From Swiss-Prot:
UniProt gene name: T3dh
Protein family per UniProt: Belongs to the iron-containing alcohol dehydrogenase family. Hydroxyacid-oxoacid transhydrogenase subfamily.
Enzyme's top EC category: oxidoreductase
EC numbers, comma separated: 1.1.99.24
Organism: Drosophila melanogaster
Assigned GO CC terms: mitochondrion
Protein localization: Mitochondrion
Entry-linked InterPro entries: ADH_Fe/GldA, ADH_Fe_C, Alcohol_dehydrogenase_Fe, HOT
Biological process, per Gene Ontology: glutamate catabolic process via 2-hydroxyglutarate
Listed name of the protein: Probable hydroxyacid-oxoacid transhydrogenase, mitochondrial
One term of GO molecular function: metal ion binding
Principal subcellular localization: mitochondrion
Pfam families, A to Z: ADH_Fe_C (PF25137), Fe-ADH (PF00465)
Function: Catalyzes the cofactor-independent reversible oxidation of gamma-hydroxybutyrate (GHB) to succinic semialdehyde (SSA) coupled to reduction of 2-ketoglutarate (2-KG) to D-2-hydroxyglutarate (D-2-HG). L-3-hydroxybutyrate (L-3-OHB) is also a substrate for HOT when using 2-KG as hydrogen acceptor, resulting in the formation of D-2-HG.
Amino acid sequence: MSRKNVLGLINTIVANSCKCPAHSHNYGSAAPTASQTGRMEYAFEMSASTVRFGPGVSAEVGADLRNLGARKVCLVTDKNVVQLPSVKVALDSLARNGINYEVYDETRVEPTDGSMWHAVEFARGKEFDAFLAIGGGSAMDTAKAANLFSSDANAEFLDYVNCPIGRGKEISVKLKPLIAMPTTSGTGSETTGVAIFDYKKLHAKTGISSKFLKPTLAVIDPLHTLSQPQRVMAFAGFDVFCHALESFTAVDYRERGLAPSDPSLRPTYQGRNPVSDVWARFALETIRKNFVNAIYQPDNLEARSQMHLASTMAGVGFGNAGVHLCHGLSYPISGNVRDYKPKGYSADHALIPHGLSVVISAPAVFEFTAPACPDRHLEAAQLLGAEVRGVEKADAGRLLADTVRGFMQRAGIENGLRELGFSSSDIPALVEGTLPQERITKLAPRAQTQENLSQLFEKSMEVY
């Protein structure tokens, strides 16, 4: 599909869909169908990977794969992580348990459609019966794609990619077991059914979303966090930060749209609910107590362990409630990078780390969304350590935005989009790149026009 045709489809969807998130229901990865009941949503469901947490627990992964009946495993990682103790511990465990394996270490930091397809072709030719992902979200998402497309050997890449960029096909094939072992405290991908990548043709991020993509088991070993460089810890931590804030302030599940006629069609991202709130609150409180120490004290196992746990907890929360504007705006930001290369990263290409692209708009976003649910924004600010006594509801957005800025400043985050290489002249392209993200931007508690999106990008040019 050409860029012109895709943008035409996007504009048609935008023009013909209600802007109020309480009456819009195209949240799944698939194309809209006449499958609603005619009544508003009345239920939510929670699903997540099995989680095992503890220092040194990664040594058990070989036994897990043996118990799953695996005989030939594809270990997906990247060129940096493959040299770290996390991979050595896993390989030793596989050897002790008699598990054959091959290592795929070509994962690209911030994957593209091309890099994911490279992994798919590797997996399709090997007849693996299980996958083990070790690394950050890039490795875990790449492993999800390799698992899916090697299980459906006839599928084309865009078949399963979210509409409107892809065809949004529902997953009906049986996937192989996937164990995810995160080495960064950020994406929460070890518990979610989402795989994100840059679609280079449109300079936009998109992904594949399905509960069937969730890893079979998440092995959360805080010892691996001690190898995270300072900047990686900071940027990944802000992904956790925004996962928790966005899921906590997302539209209520009962206001998301019409209930499906078949419960299997209930979307991956359903809106905030009482159970997702538990995970978000835990993550926000943990961030308040540990985030800054985890950045600047790399040997502080307690702080880094707690952030690792917060990442998983926030992942379970947003994996069901969803995220909204910070993530929706982040995708064209990272997709339109020119020459920015973050300090502390050994990437051979320009990139804006996902957590940085997400948090850079957060102050503007939460000032914008606060009028829709000020009590939620005040509670979020309080969970992050702000004093809320005497604060009027009208000031909820300002307080939460200032609280977010405080964390950004302490972490040494760049002062807005200008420092990432953008200017006001880029805003039309950034807005255009946000339009395909309706699947998540509709989960914001306040509807947006294109003018609103332009204003959010403009306010994010400078943060402090």
